[in-house]
């Protein structure tokens, strides 16, 4: 009997305490994690702007700006992205959104101060209106003035997610909406004649705001909105003592719009001489629409195999548009206690893009705190036409 058990009189059973096992976080791969309320060193390392261990990242002088990465993670796909990767460290992608199943209303708050009149707050509220339906609303907000002139950063990550499963446990739905705005002022760094004072250690220059920057009239913004829907229907579910076999069909719809914009009221020769214009206002948009149809076969002995067909429409909103691309492929996932094996293949069928993508990975769990991952990516890509 769990914390959702209800008497026939529709009254909730009294003196039935919710257990920590009744609070579950579900990721995009349907892996379930129990909510962890313990206070550990690992949790301390995640008490930051990215809400993750940033051991391999060197933060800039103000929270909310970019990072210098000391590691290299190769990421390949069949389609080029918008670029502006330096602004994407805090941009929540589809795989970053979690779903919840909770026995009672659940709240999580994270607060820490930032640089000079700076505050960072991440708030999440989740509730199950019934054992089968949950909705979660969350927002992370930052505003940090920074130690240097004209280096303010401000960001907002709003997300709303729901998940539902039918009474007969055959239909499953996950959906989310996110709205993100990442803004930062740019100053080009301090001037060359201030470098000696910066490095001197003189107490007169401990206050970094005394240094004059290269310019004080530039800023950039990354803004994005995404709607995501993932639904599955379980056609067959065979259970026995030795093997569990399932067959399901599914559909995924993703609609995302994002843009990156850099503005400077008057151009500056620090980056080189500009010709033909005095004011800079560069903006590029990136719209994507994805429809996925898939069918999955899973077995506790053989793992899960998924065959899929994708339709993509990608619009860069300037001279080049890539549209009406169809692709097909398969995913394979096999999990055991000590390792996880995954394989992905996707190839284009029609459209302006020709190519294929192969990914293979092996994750070895050494112990509860350590793991090793091996991954190999192979990509073939060619754009045959642009208009």
PLM region descriptions:
Residues 53-56, 79-82, 145-157, 161-223, ...:
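Outer-membrane beta-barrel translocator/channel fold
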Residues 86-87, 111-120, 145-153, 317-326, ...:
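Solvent-exposed loop/turn segments connecting transmembrane beta-strands
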Residues 91, 100-107, 113-147, 152-158, ...:
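Outer-membrane beta-barrel translocator/receptor signature
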Residues 97-104, 131-132, 167-173, 236-247, ...:
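Short loop/turn motifs that connect adjacent beta-strands in outer-membrane beta-barrel proteins
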Residues 104-113, 135-147, 309-315, 337-351, ...:
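Transmembrane beta-strand segments that form the barrel wall of outer-membrane beta-barrel proteins
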Residues 105, 119-123, 156-160, 225-229, ...:
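Hydrophobic, lipid-facing positions within transmembrane beta-strands of outer-membrane proteins
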Residues 109, 137, 162, 173-175, ...:
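Membrane-embedded beta-strand positions of outer-membrane beta-barrel proteins
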Residues 123-127, 137, 160-164, 229-235, ...:
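Residues on the lipid-exposed face of transmembrane beta-strands in outer-membrane beta-barrel proteins
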